[in-house]
Amino acid sequence: MLSATCRRLAPALRRLRALSAVAGRFLQVPGARLCSDQSERAEQPHTFHPALLQFLVCPLSKKPLRYEASTNELVNEELGIAYPIIDGIPNMIPQAARTTRQNEKQEEAEQP
């Protein structure tokens, strides 16, 4: 049964590979280049574009975020959290956010 599945899957994968090669030749974005080796890819920095801030909001509070270039994070001042930006892509999963108000919490705990 497994070999029959493999026999049916192999031609489909070959067709898919052929189609993707053809599509790669004809569906090219003007001005875009394909990187053939890793060193060329490593030279291109992945930076966050602040223009994206008009579309992004905090997933928890739905409030606008502020871009902090020094830490490369998107900050929600209201909640005191910061979302990391990795390779130019904001990681806006709430569990990935770090708190920015640790000092304030410590001060409140120390005061009687």
UniProtKB/Swiss-Prot annotation:
Record-given protein name: Protein preY, mitochondrial
Superkingdom of origin organism: Eukaryota
Domain TRM112: residue ranges: 49-95
Chief location: mitochondrion
Native species: Mus musculus (Mouse)
Transit peptide location on this chain: 1-34
Function, in words: In mitochondria, S-adenosylmethionine-dependent methyltransferase chaperone that supports both coenzyme Q biosynthesis, by stabilizing its components, such as COQ5, and NADH:ubiquinone oxidoreductase complex (complex I, MT-ND1) assembly, by stabilizing complex I assembly factors, such as NDUFAF5.
Origin organism lineage: Eukaryota, Metazoa, Chordata, Craniata, Vertebrata
Subcellular location as annotated: Mitochondrion
InterPro entries linked to this entry: Trm112-like
One Pfam family recorded for the sequence: Trm112p
UniProt keyword Transport present: no
GO biological process: GPI anchor biosynthetic process; protein stabilization
Subunit text: Interacts (via TRM112 domain) with NDUFAF5; the interaction is direct and stabilizes NDUFAF5 protein. Interacts with COQ5; the interaction is direct, stabilizes COQ5 protein and associates PYURF with COQ enzyme complex.
